[in-house]
Amino acid sequence: VTPAQALAAVKARPWFYAFELPDGTRTSCTLPPAVQPIHLTRRRVLREVLRRHMPDAAALTALDLGCHQGYFSVELAQWFRSVLAMDLRMEHLQDTELIAQAYGLAHKVRTLSGDVQTALPADALRADFVLCYGLLYHLENPLRVLRWIAQICQRALLLESQILPYELTGPIEDGQAHWARPIQGLFALAGEDAACDTSGTSGLALVPSLQAVRTALQAVGFASVTMIPPDAGDYEQFARGHRVLVYAEKG
């Protein structure tokens, strides 16, 4: 398939994302207009992080976890030497491959079918930079996945997640009244529509609070964890504290 043929195929159907295509056009987007800015905020922060923290990206590798239709995979491919795009659903990987072909980036984007919640071999998936957008809050086992990410991430992680907009502090008794452990974050149990192609597959998910994200990332091995504040004009959920972007570096 040539880039021109792939571009024609991309333009012939609607997408979850408003891709800005190489010929200057945009794909038809299935998201409501009020929600589409979420992707622009995610992309803005990704670009700022790469400019500030990864000046040598052209010599490095990237991993896009839960790549969906490849919107951020092709963005990463414009910065990094190579990109591995991973998703559980085969149709998403096929979309990612088509988009990469349309952008003329197929030689830099490789796809992998896999479930981040199963025991995947960390050695085969190591990457300098890991992108984890819109995935954590769809998972039944987020802590296990964060430990796995810490194993495969060689340098830095950029994570975006829906979060609980509130926290709970205080002690949890541990055996008797005078023994206690401090609360270090919350997880809320939420249902998932397994039939929806943007949801998890188990029917349940644990949605973290902001403190839970911070505590977990530090506990699994990230030496530096930075919450990225929203800019004026960013997607409204970031401004209201219902969604967060986090940059974390290994020691």
Task: Please name every model-derived segment.
Residues 131-132, 140-250:
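S-adenosyl-L-methionine-dependent methyltransferase catalytic module, highlighting the catalytic core
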